[in-house]
Design a protein with these regions (language model features):
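Short, solvent-exposed micro-motifs at the edges of structured domains
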Residues: 1-185
Length: 185
C-alpha cells in the first residue's frame, strides 16, 4: 500500500500565518510544500528451496522441497536468526518433485516513509530557482530482505542477513538526506 500527500504549508502571502509579511520575509518563509510518501507492506512472500541432487530424475538441480507442516512461525517467535521453521521442509524422496507451494512463507514487512520539502524562489519573470530537501526513510526503520530460503544449507536457512541497502524509493536502506538546488531561466 502506498500513500502520497502534498501539503502547502500555511505561511506567507495569502496563507493563514504571516499573510502580511514583508516581501523578503514572504520570499523566504512563504510558499513551501511538504510531500509525504509512505510505503507499507505486511509481508514479502517467498518460497523454500533445496539444492540437493536431482530427486525427480529430470536433469534438474534443486527445486521446491516437501512441506510437512506450515513453516511460518508466529510473529512473536520470529528472529533474524530463525524467521521460519526449517524443520517443516525436507528434500523430496527419489522419483518425484517436492509438494511445497510457491510463496508459502511470509517474509518481513516493509515500512518506509519519505518526505520532501520544496520551494520555488521567483527572482524575476524569467528566472527562478527551486530548492528541495529530500529525506528517505524518515524514521530510519530497518527494512529486511527475505531470509535465506535454501534448506540444504546447514544453519543458513531462515536467517536474515541483509537489509535493503541503498535508497530507491519504496526500498529504502538507512535514512538518507539529500538537498538539491536548480536554477531555471
Amino acid at each position: 500500500m502506498a500513500f502520497n500527500t502534498v501539503l502547502e504549508l500555511p505561511f506567507g502571502k495569502g496563507r493563514r500565518y504571516m499573510s502580511k509579511a514583508p516581501g523578503v520575509v514572504n520570499q523566504v518563509l512563504g510558499g513551501w510544500k511538504l510531500v509525504w510518501v509512505a510505503y507499507m507492506q505486511t509481508d514479502q512472500y517467498f518460497s523454500p528451496t533445496f539444492s540437493d541432487s536431482d530427486p525427480s530424475n529430470t536433469n534438474t538441480f534443486g527445486g521446491l522441497p516437501d512441506r510437512v507442516c506450515n513453516g511460518n512461525l508466529p510473529s512473536g517467535q520470529r528472529t533474524l536468526e530463525r524467521w521460519f521453521d526449517t524443520s517443516c521442509f525436507v528434500s523430496p524422496p527419489t522419483g518425484r518433485f517436492g509438494n511445497s507451494g510457491v510463496n508459502v512463507l511470509d517474509g518481513p514487512g516493509l515500512h518506509v516513509h519519505n518526505a520532501t520539502l520544496l520551494k520555488r524562489f521567483q527572482i524575476n519573470e524569467k528566472l527562478h530557482f527551486d530548492y528541495m530537501a529530500l529525506v528517505g526513510n524518515v524514521f530510519n526503520h530497518p527494512n529486511f530482505l527475505a531470509p535465506s530460503n535454501d534448506i540444504s544449507v546447514p544453519g543458513g536457512a531462515g536467517v536474515i542477513s541483509s537489509t535493503h541497502g541503498l535508497y530507491s524509493g519504496e526500498r529504502a536502506g538507512p535514512r538518507m538526506v539529500e538537498m538539491r538546488v536548480r536554477l531555471e531561466f
